């Protein structure tokens, strides 16, 4: 993979603007070890109008990480579990964790399509703790091996709300950042690869998988 030195692990581009994230604040761990995006497709990132379904452009509320069934799912930051188990939605089995940032800002990490959970509501969890195993629950039950994934969201409020309302780009909290190679080409994100920005500041081009 092509490397790009001197890119801050706490900076990322999303439609051009570069944002700095305090390394002692929100940026913490990743929800899976050695994270990669499903099929390296930009349409599996967070964004408005980046998916073409049923003849319409659709939003995507989070990141889809490639995760074969039974992959360990990790808490991205210290927090308290506020939801765990079957969600009775397209998300299937899921976990929601509340995090307090800088003593005042509260956000929620959300992990979906799980096969099993290891935590209960009100459990205190630590960054990197195994909280669940990935799976194919909810509307992921018919996915093939290449498409098995963990759906991860960062939210400003708990609960499942349609669209991007209450959703935050996951790059705000994860260690490893992912951005589209060409974010301006909205209607073609399913045919565009990604750029992976590692914790050490190096970046790698990942061409999309057309299989």
What are these model-derived regions, one by one?
Residues 77, 84-85, 98-100, 110-115, ...:
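Active-site-proximal beta-strand/loop segments in catalytic clefts of secreted hydrolases
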Residues 1-3, 17-18, 86-87, 157-160:
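Acidic glycine-/aspartate-rich tracts in secreted/extracellular proteins
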Residues 28-93, 102, 127, 136, ...:
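Surface-exposed, glycine-biased beta-strand/turn segments
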Residues 63, 93-120, 147:
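Active-site region of chymotrypsin-like
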Residues 95-97, 123-197:
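Conserved, short, structured surface segments that act as functional micro-motifs
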Residues 89, 101-107, 159-165:
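Short, solvent-exposed loop/turn segments that connect beta-strands within catalytic domains
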Residues 71-73, 77, 107-110, 168:
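Structural detector for hydrophobic anchor residues on beta-strands
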Residues 1-30, 186, 192-201:
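Short turn/helix-capping motifs enriched in Asx and small/polar residues
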């Amino acid at each position: 993979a092509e490397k790009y030195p001197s890119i801050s692990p706490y900076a990322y581009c999303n439609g051009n603007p570069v944002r700095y994230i305090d390394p002692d604040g929100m940026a913490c761990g990743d929800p899976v070890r050695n994270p990669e995006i499903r099929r390296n497709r930009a349409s599996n990132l967070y964004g408005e109008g980046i998916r073409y379904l049923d003849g319409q452009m659709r939003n995507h509320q989070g990141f889809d990480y490639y995760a074969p069934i039974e992959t360990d799912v990790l808490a991205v930051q210290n927090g308290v579990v506020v939801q765990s188990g079957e969600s009775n939605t397209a998300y299937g089995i899921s976990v929601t964790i509340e995090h307090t940032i800088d003593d005042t800002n509260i956000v929620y990490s959300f992990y979906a399509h799980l096969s099993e959970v290891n935590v209960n509501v009100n459990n205190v969890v630590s960054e990197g703790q195994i909280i669940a195993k990935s799976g194919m629950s909810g509307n992921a039950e018919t996915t093939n091996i290449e498409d098995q994934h963990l759906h991860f969201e960062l939210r400003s409020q708990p609960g499942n709300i349609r669209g991007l309302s209450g959703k935050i780009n996951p790059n705000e909290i994860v260690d490893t950042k992912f951005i589209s190679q060409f974010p301006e080409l909205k209607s073609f994100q399913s045919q565009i690869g990604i750029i992976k920005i590692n914790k050490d500041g190096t970046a790698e081009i990942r061409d999309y998988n057309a299989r």
